[in-house]
Amino acid sequence: MCNRQPKAVDLPPNYSCPHLLSFQSVEFNTNPTACDDVFCKRIESEKKYNDFLESLFKKYGRDTSDIADEVDLATGEIIVNNGHLEALKTKDDIWDPTFNNLEISASNGYEKKLDSSIGNPGEKAVSPVHIEDFQSPQIYKFKNLSLRDEMVSDCVFADEVPLASLFVENVCNETIPSQSCVRLKINDKTRKVDASALEKKSCLLPNSSGTLTDQRGLDTIKHKSIEQNEILHVISDTLSSPRRRNPLLSSPKTPLRRSFSKSKVRNSNSTKRRNFISLISMISPRPNLSTHHFNLGFQPLSQQTSFSGSSTQNPHSSSTCKKAFCFQCISESKKC
């Protein structure tokens, strides 16, 4: 901890101050603060650390230039060989004499990994097409096992077909297992659509050779574009309609739920109107709702006609009025 002594400050001879005219020097008594203590402790700890490192180097440090290995960084050759690098060397290192070139070693390692990924020599050879099929997405849930056996593992889609059509087959198999599906092949891209919807749109079926032919045996090369548009239209119709409105995709076990919020609002509005009508029925004569600024959009015509008919035949009188609260009776009593 450092202790600072008060210092005397000498003012210049031409210094003029109205409050210090009778003083030649000013003394400032400065006491050390917490910041000063922290600053002094940091200086002392840094000096102690430097002294400790210096003592370590003096005790254990030595010059290793005479025993170390020296390597030329440009060529990678060992200029001064004292055996240190040779002891650390392995057969897979870059400077191993069996591998003179880095590119040859890298290519050999890649070929080994490729051979191990394909399989043993005794196994069946795997073509690059099968490797792409293995990496392609697949559908794993099937209710109909025959469709699973017939399905091609390659699931490449055309740009015109939406991506959501991948799940059409899975949804049909889950909801309606007995629904028959027909597989169509468009430009080597497999699709399955509903048979009932297909009969309405087209009469084309696949043959054993994989090409589309007409039921009457006609050539369909001229109708290729028309056929593709029809099939895409069937798929888009199946996917565009929501699941709750499509009877083929909606499950019979789960009925449609009625919105609770809408029914609550409807009940509250009907309750307000019913209470308002019951309140109006206590008032006579009945007011015209169209004259008020809070017009509710309805008017009890039947009650107005009955009142108008009764008013012409039986005029109102306080003696014959049976209502508990009547404005007309009160107004007549005030006039009297």
Curated annotation (Swiss-Prot):
- Keyword Cytoplasm (UniProt): yes
Return the GO cellular component terms, semicolon-separated: chromosome, centromeric core domain; chromosome, centromeric region; cytosol; nucleus
GO BP, sorted A to Z: CENP-A containing chromatin assembly
Query: Keyword Nucleus, does the record have it?
Result: yes
Which keywords appear in this protein's UniProt record, sorted alphabetically? Answer: Cytoplasm, Nucleus
Main localization of the protein described in the UniProt heading: cytoplasm
Q: What Gene Ontology molecular function terms does this protein carry?
A: histone binding; histone chaperone activity; protein heterodimerization activity
Please note every region of biased composition (Basic residues). 255-269
Q: Disordered: where is this region?
A: 243-269
Subcellular locations according to the entry: Cytoplasm; Nucleus
Give the Pfam families listed for this entry: Scm3
Role, per record: Centromeric protein that plays a central role in the incorporation and maintenance of histone H3-like variant CENPA at centromeres.
Q: What is this protein called?
A: CENP-A histone chaperone scm3
Q: Which organism is it from?
A: Schizosaccharomyces pombe (strain 972 / ATCC 24843)
